Amino acid sequence: IVSMGGLYEFYMLMEKVGFKPKKSAAMAVGSLIYGIIVMYSFGEFNFAYLLFIFPLLVSLVALELFRKSKDPVTNIAFSVMGILYVVIPLSIVNFFAYDPTYYNEMDINTNNYSSLLLVGFFVIQWANDSGAYLFGSLLGKYKLFERISPNKTWEGFYGGALLAVITGIIFGQFDGAVIHWIIVALIIVIFGTLGDLTESQIKR
C-alpha cells in the first residue's frame, strides 16, 4: 500500500510538471515487481524469479508503442524511474526485517523476523531530518545548495549528521555493532540528503 501510494504520488508529480508516464500500467508492473522481491526476501521464491523483473520493465516500453505521444522516450523513462526510485527501494526494506543470518549471529530469537534494523534505519533518518531542521533553523548561515533547496544549510547538514550518529550509537548498544551503526548513520545522512536534493530538483 505504501509502495503503490508513493508510486502514485511520484507519477502525479511528474504529470504536474508536464510529463506523461504510463501511470496505470507502471503501477501494475510496480506491484508485480514488489511482490516478486518481497517473496524472494521471505525465501518463497528463488533467484530465478528475480529475472522476471527485466521483462516487466521492458513491457512498459512495448505498451508505449500503442500510445500516441510527442515524447515517448521521456514518458518511458519516467515510468521506469518511478519503479526504480520508489518500488524497488521499498521492497528491499523487507530484507532488513527478514535476515536470519544477522539475527542468528546476534542470538536474537526472532523466527527470522526482527524490526531492529528496520526501526533503526527509520529512526536514524528521522534523527537526521530533525537535527538538520533544528540546527539549520537556529544556526543556519551557509547554504548547502541554494539553487535547488534554498532552506538547506551546512549547519543543518552537520547537525543532522551529529544527531544521526548519536542515534546510531544508541542502537549499537542492542547488538554490540556500534561501528556498523555509525557507518549506517553516515550512509543514511549522505544519501538521505542527496535524495532530498533530488526530490527538490524534480519539484522545481
Question: Residue locations for each model-derived region?
Answer:
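Membrane-embedded alpha-helical bundles of polytopic integral membrane proteins
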Residues: 1-153, 157-186
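Transmembrane alpha-helical segments of integral membrane proteins
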Residues: 58-62, 194-204
